[in-house]
Regions:
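NTP/phosphate- and nucleic-acid-binding module
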Residues: 61-63, 129
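A short beta-alpha structural unit
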Residues: 5-12, 37-57, 77, 81-83
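Anion (oxyanion) recognition and catalysis
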Residues: 33, 65, 86
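His/Asp/Glu-rich mid-to-C-terminal helical/loop segments that flank catalytic regions of hydrolases
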Residues: 15-16, 21-27, 96-134
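Short glycine-/small-residue-rich flexible loop motifs, especially phosphate/cofactor-binding loops
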Residues: 29, 61, 82-83
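Zn-dependent metallopeptidase/amidohydrolase metal-coordination segment
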Residues: 1, 71-120
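Flexible, glycine/charged-enriched surface loops at secondary-structure junctions
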Residues: 30-42, 68-75, 131-134
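A glycine- and small/hydrophobic-rich beta-loop-beta segment
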Residues: 1-38
Length: 134
């Protein structure tokens, strides 16, 4: 038989990612030996973790506090547009609550109320950034 799968490894730092990949390779080595199978790997994409701008994060958190919206800092660990924009601009992200935490899948759903809350936080955050520029 043959098995193919894609494994996406994410981490907050390159060191975290490298450590996890090393552990995975060590397990593959054990599997090869124990089961007498061939394991082939291919690195399709290697993206470095991106740290977003803390000044912008502070403006977002201030906006959330002003609107009594709970704040949860979340490391996305996914390649979003923000990770590409961070090369040329100050960048941060606002995550919209989704039902059962589902994201980037057909079951993803955010209520109109949650979208409105996040949109108003974003608007206030933009105004907060604008105040800093004056």
């Amino acid at each position: 038989g043959k098995v193919e799968f894609i494994l996406e490894v994410r981490g907050e730092t390159e060191e975290d990612i490298q450590r996890l990949v090393a552990n995975i390779k060590a397990e593959w080595k054990k599997i090869r030996k124990a089961r007498q199978v061939d394991v082939k790997e291919q690195n399709i994409l290697n993206q470095k973790p991106v740290h977003l701008d803390m000044d912008i994060v502070a403006c977002i958190e201030k906006a959330a506090q002003e609107r009594h919206v709970p704040i949860v800092r979340l490391a996305s660990m996914a390649g979003h547009d923000a990770s590409h924009m961070a090369d040329i601009s100050k960048t941060a992200m606002i995550f919209v609550k989704s039902i059962n935490g589902k994201s980037h899948c057909p079951q993803e759903y955010s209520t109109p109320d949650d979208i409105e809350i996040a949109s108003n936080v974003m608007l206030q955050a933009i105004l907060n950034v604008d105040e800093q520029l004056d």
